[in-house]
Design a protein with these regions (language model features):
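A structural signal for multi-pass alpha-helical bundles of membrane permease subunits
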Residues: 12-16, 20-296
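Short, Lys/Arg-rich, polar N-terminal cytosolic tail immediately upstream
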Residues: 1-16
Length: 296
């Protein structure tokens, strides 16, 4: 039995929907303000003359780019070799090398492991799936000391290997790739096998080309995570010429004072690549998350 809604009922429902919409918009606005205020303060401080006292204004006064120039050249004072001075460009290059290697090689390792877990049956498969998921639940600080001892034993301290190799495989990456691969029709793999293709050829020419959304998502996630690494490089890297940008920002904090203008200029330069990356690839990022959530 269908009951027709009276005009008063329709008006009441529209009013409720408007109130809900207003409340949601208000929550989003408040959340945006809370999230953006620190960034606005950082940008205002970077564009204002350097000061030893933290400024309180969100509007820069006497706008200047001096802080960016000084921040770029500030590391020269800490360079162990005057003939090859260290600048912010050195730290950017270190971060770029680590980010590109972790992102590119990590996607290969995660996708290969996920392909096996999605398309192959073998003894202990469920255990490997469980272990991949379990690594997402273990805090990084639990494994920090054992990993450091291994790195020291291998004599990788102050090398790129120490900052790259431990993070090539990730439980989250394997899980997302596997979830996406499970949504792919198994007939595609079988057709490739009938044509005489090996497992690796099926993976390379059939599975990966139709997995671009999840590849894009994982590339963004891995790039953001590796670019923002702080604790691990701080521990395994004591050579200033090998430090990534996030660790190098510490030099603007002295024992008794902080160069706020230089630090905020350095932080602005440090986050700029990630902001550009996300703005250029946000559609792929959202589409990849949706694609990876089809099956578990």
């Amino acid at each position: 039995m269908v009951v027709d809604k009276t005009p008063n009922t329709l008006v009441s429902e529209r009013a409720k929907n408007r109130v809900k919409s207003l409340v949601m918009n208000l929550i989003l606005i408040v959340g945006s303000v809370v999230m953006l205020t620190p960034l606005l303060w950082m940008l205002a401080t970077a564009l204002s003359p350097n000061t030893k006292i933290p400024p309180t204004s969100l509007i820069p006064h006497d706008i200047t780019l001096e802080n960016f120039v000084e921040a770029w050249n500030f590391p020269k004072a800490f360079s162990p070799n005057p003939d090859h001075p260290v600048t912010m460009g050195t730290f950017f290059m270190n971060s770029l090398i680590c980010t590109v290697c972790i992102t590119a090689l990590g996607i290969i390792v995660d996708s290969l492991a996920a392909y096996v877990l999605a398309f192959k049956d073998f003894p202990g498969k469920r255990l490997f799936i469980f272990l991949a998921l379990a690594t997402m639940m273990i805090p990084f600080y639990v494994t920090l000391v054992p990993e450091y001892l291994i790195i020291r034993k291998l004599k990788w301290i102050n090398t790129y290997k120490a900052m790259i190799i431990p993070f090539l495989a990730s439980g989250m990456g394997i899980s997302l790739f596997r979830a996406h691969f499970l949504s792919i029709a198994k007939e595609l793999e079988e057709c490739g096998k009938l044509d005489g293709a090996s497992d690796f050829r099926v993976y390379l020419t059939i599975v990966m080309p139709i997995s671009r959304p999840i590849i894009g998502t994982m590339a963004i996630l891995k790039a953001m995570w590796s670019w923002n690494q702080y604790m691990w490089p701080l521990i395994v890297c004591t050579d200033i010429s090998k430090k990534p940008i996030q660790v190098a920002l510490n030099m603007f904090r002295g024992l008794n004072l902080t160069e706020w203008g230089y630090m905020c200029a350095g932080m602005t330069m440090a986050i700029l690549p990630l902001v550009i990356l996300f703005l250029c690839a946000q559609k792929q990022f959202i589409g990849g998350l949706q694609a990876g959530a089809v099956k578990g």
